[in-house]
A protein has these predicted regions:
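ATP-dependent carboxylate-amine ligase
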Residues: 1-13, 34-37, 245, 282, ...
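Short glycine-rich anion-binding loops that position phosphate/pyrophosphate groups of nucleotides
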Residues: 43-45, 177-178, 199-201, 234-235, ...
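A short, gly/pro- and small-residue-rich
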Residues: 48-64, 75-84, 191-196, 212-216, ...
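Phosphate-binding loop of NTP-binding sites
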Residues: 85-232, 236-246, 301, 362-363
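N-terminal leader/targeting and accessory segments in enzymes
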Residues: 1-87, 91, 223, 264, ...
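Acidic, Mg2+-coordinating active-site environments of NTP-dependent enzymes
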Residues: 4, 9, 65, 69-72, ...
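A short acidic, helix-capping loop that chelates divalent metal ions and anchors anionic groups
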Residues: 71-72, 139-143, 200-206, 377, ...
Length: 483
């Protein structure tokens, strides 16, 4: 793309604009390539303006900056390079958001689950759908790992372009508060913006200085979308939609909502844990959700409300929710016996308490929790996780997680400090593969077993190296060896 064409996306100042073709947009000088435009971003730990010369020496054809920099190539000045990168990226990749329906989801909890519920419903209706979020970028059989829930705006545009080229009609995106703060989703309009809930999180450090800023960042989505889907049961919802510019559609248990949930009940059969509830208001039907926990009624109702606005048939909503699966989030793994085996990402005391409390409500014969703890992380997490599992599980199976540079036995010793505060039973099997084998071989009818900690991860980190370790593959290998 010609530089002059690219720059039509932003306001800028320059003595001259060379007649050059731009091969890529780059904001990390280490990734500069011949013919690229290097955009100087200020981050929490580094300032891209200091690396402009390095980028030019590696072949950058032009530097885009907020202030004059020393470089042997033309320098284009603009007021906010982070915002400029968003608009430049949209132009460079051909405005992919205008070629499909883009849905953004924000909230403290529930973004990932709601995103996958949306995907399951939309694909049940015959619409190819991509997802950008915590688990990475997913469309078709393609899964790309990412570092952040909401990637940098250049990556967001690149991934959306890939989705359009792959035939996606919809893109469902988790939109974090930091992503909004850093303009990672600027440069396009969301068709829908979904709000799940709001509670204290991400305060301090390089994130948000206080709750007011956190809420203000969340609220930005509702000035960037055409229609907002809002949980009116959340006491903070009025702050979230303050100064909104979109249409508002509401959901919740509150009878004044446009879409109302009621009559929820837990559903269980061997290998299946879920929840059933009724929807009234603008639609009237019953939904079965293939993810356990009454709190998932909110996530499902959010997805239902959004899909109704998109004119998706109720039958597709029902099919999608009944078959939804979120990798690593209370993910069921088919078993030959009359017990339930789940994989979950719970890796701290809060998330472990949530998942074990949820599963306890299904009245299992035994609730077995297999878990470890990350190495080179605060020891207090291990104490707390041991105490939570000891109090809530009938049996804890403690094993390795990502031990990193620590000895697994030292980590397990710390977990046992927490277990010792309870009357909970436990066994210790340091090898995670063997711990999984033990759980399967010793399962009894009616048991619920949760393998906690790894979730969607497909590796184990030991002594600085990541070794392949996908629990789904491990389980399949164990079952094959038992035949």
């Amino acid at each position: 793309m010609k530089l002059k064409q690219l720059l039509t996306a932003i306001k800028y100042r320059a003595e001259q604009v060379p007649d050059v073709d731009i091969t890529d947009l780059v904001y990390d000088s280490r990734k500069a390539v011949p013919g690229c435009a290097f955009v100087c971003l200020r981050g929490a730990n580094a300032d891209g303006h200091k690396y402009a010369k390095m980028a030019a020496e590696k072949g950058a054809a032009v530097i885009i900056a907020e202030e004059p920099v020393e470089a042997p190539v033309p320098v284009i000045l603009t007021d906010n390079t982070r915002l400029a990168l968003a608009y430049l990226s949209a132009e460079f990749f051909g405005h992919p958001a205008e070629q499909m329906h883009v849905i953004g989801i924000t909230g403290t909890k529930g973004k990932t689950t709601t995103a996958f519920m949306m995907r399951s419903i939309l694909e049940a209706a015959g619409h190819k759908t991509g997802v950008i979020g915590t688990i990475g970028v997913l469309y078709g059989d393609t899964l790309i790992q990412t570092d952040n829930t909401t990637p940098e705006n250049h990556e967001v545009q690149k991934f959306m372009r890939q989705m359009v080229d792959a035939g996606c009609e919809y893109c469902v995106m988790e939109v974090s508060s930091i992503g909004l703060k850093d303009h990672r989703v600027a440069g396009f309009t969301f068709e829908l913006g979904l709000f799940t809930n709001f509670s204290e999180d991400h305060i301090g450090g390089a994130e948000h200085k206080d709750m007011a800023e956190y809420m203000a960042c969340k609220s930005m989505l509702f000035r960037m979308c055409r229609t907002g889907i809002i949980n009116i049961d959340d006491p903070n919802y009025t702050g979230i939609i303050k100064n909104h510019t979109c249409n508002i559609v509401t959901y919740g248990y509150d009878k004044s909502a446009d879409f109302v949930a009621h009559g929820e009940e837990l559903v269980t059969t061997p290998g299946f844990l879920g929840v059933r509830f009724s929807v009234t208001g603008k639609l009237n039907f019953t939904a079965d959700v293939a993810i356990p926990g009454k709190f998932n009624v909110y996530n499902a109702l959010c997805a239902i409300t959004a899909c109704s606005v998109l004119n998706i048939p109720v039958t597709a909503m029902q099919r999608g929710l009944k078959t939804v699966k979120v990798k690593g989030r209370v993910e069921p793994v088919p078993m030959p016996g009359d017990f339930t085996l789940l994989i979950d990402y719970a890796h701290n005391a809060v998330s472990m308490q949530s998942i074990l409390t949820t599963l306890r409500a299904y009245n299992p014969k035994r609730l077995i929790c297999m878990f470890g703890a990350g190495g080179n992380r605060p020891k207090v997490r291990r104490f707390e996780m041991g105490e939570v599992s000891g109090n809530l599980a009938d049996l804890s199976v403690i094993t390795a997680d990502n031990s990193r540079y620590e000895n697994v036995l030292d980590i397990l010793a710390d977990i046992k400090v927490g277990l010792a505060k309870t009357d909970g039973k436990y066994i210790e099997i340091p090898d995670r593969r063997e711990a999984i084998r033990w759980c399967i071989e010793n399962a009894q009818p009616g048991d619920i077993i949760v393998l906690a900690g790894k979730g969607h991860e497909d590796y184990q980190e030991i002594e600085g190296k990541k070794y392949p370790f996908d629990e789904r593959v491990v389980i399949r290998e164990i079952l094959d060896s038992m035949k």
